[in-house]
Amino acid sequence: DDQTAGRGQRGNTWESECGKNLTFSTVLYPTALEAKEQFHLSMAIAFATVDALENYTDGFSIKWPNDIYWKDKKIAGILIENELEGKFITQSIVGIGLNVNQEVFRSSAPNPVSLIQILGVTINRQELLDRILRGIMASYIFLEKDYKAAVHNLRQLYIRRLYRKE
């Protein structure tokens, strides 16, 4: 429930007040995903996260490649680390940091926002976590069972939700 060394891409840090946010990792074991296709997994994770957030309000978008925004403010970051065997991904560690109930941000991050700031009410973190994990698993299973159809659908959904795509 407390993250002490949150990180993002290129060594950036992630600030999280103890007991207020979601900072978690989950491990996936792809069976036939090539390293060159790793972005398809990233699309699935980002979409599942946005989809879960849209149960609370709208206005969320995906800032390529791995940030979730509400309007012009960052609410979440996603980091995926893959292990390879030959040209295939054998393990993916998916880390997500999501601002839920934190009201004050002290870091130098330029534009953080949390669900409590957006909605004005405390959010049940366990319920939100369950929604995100269910979405991740549904997207992941779809990728594993019908890769071509899943990629086609995810690409359309992802593009529709891109931040500043105009």
Which ranges hold each PLM region?
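Phosphate/pyrophosphate-binding loops and the adjoining catalytic core of nucleotide-dependent enzymes
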Residues: G6
